[in-house]
Structure formats: C-alpha cells, structure tokens
C-alpha cells in the first residue's frame, strides 16, 4: 500500500488546498513514473478511506499524551511552526500515522532512519491495544534502504520541497544540473587542492545513491580526501548519473501525463482495495472494544 496522507497535509497547508490537490496528482504520477505497478501496489488517498480517521480517533484514547510529546519528528516540526498554527490536528498527526500503518495491518514499513521512532511508537500502540482488548494488530517492522536518508541539496537536514532543497523526479535535465552544481559540499574546502571531508558530504551521499560506477566514486573520494580534484568535476559526474537515472522515469511520467484516465483508475482501484481491508480491520477493532453492537440485546 502506498498512501497519500492528505489529512496530515492539512496540518500546515490548511490555507493552500490547491497545493494539496496538486500534490496528490504529482505524487501519483511519481509513483507510476518510477515503475510501481498499480495492479500489484494499491495507491490510496487517505481522505478517501474514512476508516483512517475513525481508527486515529479510537487509538488516541489509549495513547498517553507523553508518547506524542516525545515523538522527535513532531517536536522538531512544532519548533518550526508559529504558535498560532499549532492546531490539535497537527499535534495529533503522529497518531494518524500510527493508524496509517495499523489499518492495513502492515507487517513491514519502508522508512528513512529518521522515521524509526515513529514505527516503534506504532509497535507500542499495537501492543497496548492487543493487551487491552484483543490480538488485532501485528507489530510492524521497519525496512530501511541502502541509503537511509538523503540530505537536502543545501546540506540542511533532509530534502524538503518547502525549503527548496530538493531534486524532483519531474525535474528536467537542465534543472537537475543547475541544482547539482549549487549543492553544498565541505564548507572548509575553499580550493581544489585542499583535502576535503567525504563523510556527511551531500554530493558523495548522492553519488552513493545514484551513481552505479563504484570505481569512479572510490576514485573521487580518494582524490577529494587528498585535495586532488575540484568540486565541479565531481558535481558534473553526479548530474550525469542522476539524469541517466531519471531518463526512463521522465519517459514514463510523460506517458501517464498524456493518459490521465489511467492515473485516476490507479487511485480509485487502490482505494477500493483498501476499503475492503479497512472495513474488516475496523470490524475487528469495534468487536474487540465492544462498541459495535450496543442495541443487540435491546429486546
């Protein structure tokens, strides 16, 4: 299951619904462009499945406030948010993320390493529900990729569209090259003959992720540490590698942009499949909590 969490996007984009609407389309196009098969993977818009909201509400009653307050992602985002925009809905979005995982009864969740605490929180909530009521939810495991997180192109935290430090899957060759040329490197290396730091350097992080030529990467790293290579050579090789990686993605994206009925079909089919599973999960939840049949014996 691949989820577009549009409810959660309301937390900091409530006054820009058009942005959310466009993002739903762009994310779906990205999924199709990278080769996800909608017959094997269900694409789901969160608000199209009301059981997500219901499960969020029910699980919030068994979740201590302190568990949300300890969530590192929430703490960081609250610090960056004006106090007037700190809504109850925004504060509760980690609970919504828990429901995102538990409603389809997921066993494995692909995440970046910054989301590991969230999956652990989901496991805690699942354990507590199962202990209090009935064994309904599996405890999901995390799946972290070979590159657990990509830094932003400016070296400031992870990629963020709002911060403008991101390379989009839809970027053309010229845009990618421009962004790569301006990427943050080692700030202490002001000349090509000064030894540089590879560790934590976004340019090398991206090489590791997108450049299949490992011999070239090893050569670049060795020469960079020795002060025998300039940033421009490394960045131009990276731009070429990323553009080569993106070429088939751009081609598939153009196809789906010309066949929007297939995009809508992918979403609606995924939502329909999710609704079947969601209904069964919520029946188990309501039965376990004994809130599904108040009037059963009213005779």
What are these regions (language model features)?
Residues 73-76, 80-125, 129, 133, ...:
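Internal, conserved structured core segments that host functional sites
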Residues 65-69, 103-110, 211-220, 250:
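Short helix-capping/linker segments at secondary-structure and domain boundaries
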Residues 117, 123-299:
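Conserved nucleotide- and phosphate/pyrophosphate-binding catalytic cores
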Residues 1-99, 254:
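N-terminal Rossmann-like or analogous alpha/beta NTP/dinucleotide-binding catalytic cores
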Residues 18-25, 116-119, 264:
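Non-membrane alpha-helical structural segments and their capping/turn regions in soluble enzymes
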Residues 10-13, 103-107, 158-159:
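Active-site-proximal beta-alpha loop/turn segments in soluble metabolic enzymes
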Residues 28, 35, 63-67, 106, ...:
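A generic secondary-structure signal for well-formed alpha-helical elements
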